[in-house]
Amino acid sequence: MPKADIHPEWYPEAKVYCNGEVVMTVGSTQPEIHVDVWSGNHPYFTGTQKIIDTEGRVERFMRKYSKQEGSGSKSNKSKSTKSKKGKGKK
């Protein structure tokens, strides 16, 4: 038996609104739920999604990080020499 006066009120027929229209009813602790997107107007679920990938993700990643290899190797060398010097001073 649940404890009295600690549970929120349950609304078995709570209305879900999207753009001012009732799109569905669900059970909730709120009588009305206002949403911006739901499965009825989301591009993925309606089939109107357009994927525009002018450059592949792998190619973009390789191009981005291949430029940084030359500059990144200099900073790695200076860090490694500093750490070796610091260990010998103890």
UniProtKB/Swiss-Prot annotation:
Residues 76-90 have a biased composition (Basic residues). PROSITE patterns: RIBOSOMAL_L31. GO terms for biological process: translation. Keywords: Ribonucleoprotein, Ribosomal protein, RNA-binding, rRNA-binding. Gene3D superfamilies: Ribosomal protein L31. GO terms for molecular function: rRNA binding; structural constituent of ribosome. The keyword Ligase does not apply. It holds the Pfam family Ribosomal_L31. Binds the 23S rRNA. This is Large ribosomal subunit protein bL31. It comes from Trichodesmium erythraeum (strain IMS101).
